[in-house]
Design a protein with these regions (language model features):
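Intrinsic-disorder-associated, low-complexity terminal segments enriched in Asp/Asn/His/Tyr and depleted
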Residues: 490, 515, 521, 529-531, ...
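Phosphate/pyrophosphate-binding loops at sites that engage ATP/ADP/AMP, CoA/4′-phosphopantetheine
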Residues: 71-87, 231-258, 277-282, 358-366
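Conserved catalytic cysteine-centered active-site region
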Residues: 43-66, 95-151, 282-350
């Protein structure tokens, strides 16, 4: 089949979404229970109260650039990509170390030896929304007339640190890179996306000389839950509208029963558990005649007349619906909290860390034929996956629990000292980071030095040995060795026979890739295969699609 060319009005790529997903988190952590004792707070305040077990944090040698360099390099290496197979690179982050120079420009150093500077995209910054906005931008590019047949890469990365006090245990750090293109195992659905935006001073960073945010905790939680309410309402309305237009629609309101799994942006795990209860409250109030004498809504009759806007601070409502939704939480959400509970809040990558955690612990059979709801505070996405290519994506994340176990535990007093030193050296010129980079994971990029003009120099360690840019990039696979066999095209845009053959034969951690030489897509809603997963997202933006069997 002909490959899609820019400006083609006859076809657009089919099943655009996430082809591969790579996760990076720091190599050291602090135990939350030990941090409770060190901070002199009551036992369980961080562990039971917040639902957090451990918190990852960055060493002095790591910054937002090094995190993103590491995760992009790892995505390319494990996927056997060539650097010239990437035509767009988007970065979502709120960790700003330069008011003008984007993180994306630093990442372009990885492309240098390939000669590929024709890479669109830039940084997107708006608290935790930037990652999902970047994903939508990348997908829109692939689906647009500007697409030139290459992949897009989306990077979400942040370092979440707080001043000493109650907020510090809700920190974390990490980065996630996603490969975006056609025929993906996780597909961004068309037709279901709801958005909620508003102005609020709940969380912001007005002091550019500090990494620490200004936070109004109670207001921030209220904003989070209000966004969840409004986006779920928009999502439900659009989903029900699609049902009515479908030929074989399932009658009745859209409810949590329509999701097999639910994943959320996770500032701390306890808020996610409350959010599941919040969604159940929405279903309860929207139900025409809920049965309160038994079943899911048993005993909830006293709350039948409440208004959502009056319940954000009601502990009675929160407790009742959290208890009623406990089994839903255990089945649909708890498996996704592995990374959040053990590494903490990563900001822009947070919800994608939950997606990675879910994929790392579920089989393709668990996910096939189901819908996954995803709430990203600030936005959302939807996806589906055929069971075969989904297997390959799952296998690439199978080592996530082992990687968490391989980290180094740091005593709370040492953690506090590292945070103090980080505060003192933040944005310091003519500076060499304290300590050794050899404690980082092998293959991690690190900050080597900041010169007197604030220019940052990076290197990559491999088993403790420093590797400069030039040595690292000479071994990059050629286009013919990458998984992007579709890029082996003749001048007419037809995929060459050799290029087509590569598509199903390339080795790698994800195994052979599906055929990408056919990219024709009808924009009308199509029947889906019974063994496909739908991931519908809820947030300040929401996307999803009805799942139905093949005609």
């Amino acid at each position: 089949h002909p490959a899609a060319l820019p400006g083609s009005s006859q076809a657009c790529p089919e099943d655009v979404g996430i082809l591969a997903l790579e996760v990076y988190f720091p190599a050291q952590y602090v135990e939350q229970a030990e941090l409770e004792r060190y901070d002199g707070v009551e036992a369980g305040k961080y562990t039971r109260g917040l639902g957090q077990q451990q918190m990852g944090f960055c060493a002095a040698h790591e910054d937002i650039n090094s995190l993103c360099l590491t995760v992009v390099q790892r995505l390319v290496e494990r996927g056997r990509l060539s650097w010239d197979a990437i035509g767009r690179l988007e970065v979502g982050t709120e960790t700003v170390i330069d008011k003008s120079k984007a993180v994306k420009t630093v990442l372009m150093e990885l492309f240098r030896d390939s000669g590929n500077s024709d890479v669109e995209g830039i940084d997107t910054t708006n608290a935790c929304y930037g990652g999902t906005a970047s994903l939508f931008n990348a997908a829109a590019w692939v689906e647009s007339s500007a697409w030139d047949g290459r992949y897009a890469v989306v990077v979400c990365g942040d370092i979440a640190v707080y001043a000493t006090g109650n907020a510090r245990p809700t920190g974390g750090a990490g980065a996630i890179a996603m490969l975006v293109g056609p025929n993906a195992p996780l597909v961004l659905e068309r037709g279901l996306r709801g958005t909620h935006m508003e102005h609020a001073y709940d969380f912001y960073k007005p002091d550019l000389a500090s990494e620490y945010p200004v936070v109004d905790g109670p207001l921030s939680i209220q904003c989070y839950l209000r966004a969840l309410d409004r986006c779920y309402a928009v999502y439900r309305r659009k989903a029900e509208s699609q049902r009515q237009q479908g030929e074989r629609c399932r009658r009745g309101p859209f409810t949590l029963d329509d999701f097999k799994f639910l994943i959320f942006h996770t500032p701390f795990c306890k808020l996610v558990q409350k959010s599941v209860g919040r969604l159940l409250l929405n279903d309860f109030l929207a139900a025409p005649n809920p049965d309160t004498s038994g079943g899911l809504y048993k005993g909830l009759q006293p709350f039948r007349g409440v208004k959502l806007e009056d319940t954000y601070t009601s502990k009675e409502v929160e407790k009742a619906f959290q208890a009623a939704s406990q089994e839903i939480f255990n089945q649909k959400t708890k498996p996704s909290l592995l990374l959040s509970s053990r590494n903490g809040n990563m900001y822009t990558p947070s919800m994608y860390g939950c997606l990675a955690s879910l994929l790392a612990q579920c089989s393709a059979q668990d996910l096939a034929g189901s819908r996954i709801g995803a709430f990203s505070y600030g936005s959302g996405l939807a996806a589906r996956g055929r069971s075969s290519p989904l297997d390959k994506l799952l296998s690439s994340l199978a080592d996530l629990p082992a990687r968490l176990d391989a980290r180094k535990r740091v005593a709370p007093q040492d953690f506090a000292e590292i945070m103090k030193r980080r505060e003192e050296t933040h944005h310091l010129a003519n500076h060499t980071p304290h300590g050794s980079h050899t404690d980082l994971f092998p293959g991690t990029w690190y900050l080597e030095r900041v010169d007197d003009k604030y220019r940052r120099q990076y290197a990559r360690n491999s088993g403790g040995a420093k590797m400069p840019f030039s040595q690292l990039l000479t071994a990059a696979p050629s286009p013919g060795e990458s998984l992007g066999g579709q890029f082996l095209m003749d001048k007419s845009g037809e995929a060459t026979r050799e290029g087509s053959a590569l598509l199903g034969a390339l080795p790698g951690p994800w195994g052979p890739w599906p055929d990408r030489t056919s990219v024709r897509h009808q924009r009308l809603q199509r029947p889906l295969h019974p063994e496909q997963t739908v991931l519908g997202a809820m947030g300040q933006s929401l996307e999803g699609q009805r799942l139905r069997g093949r005609d």
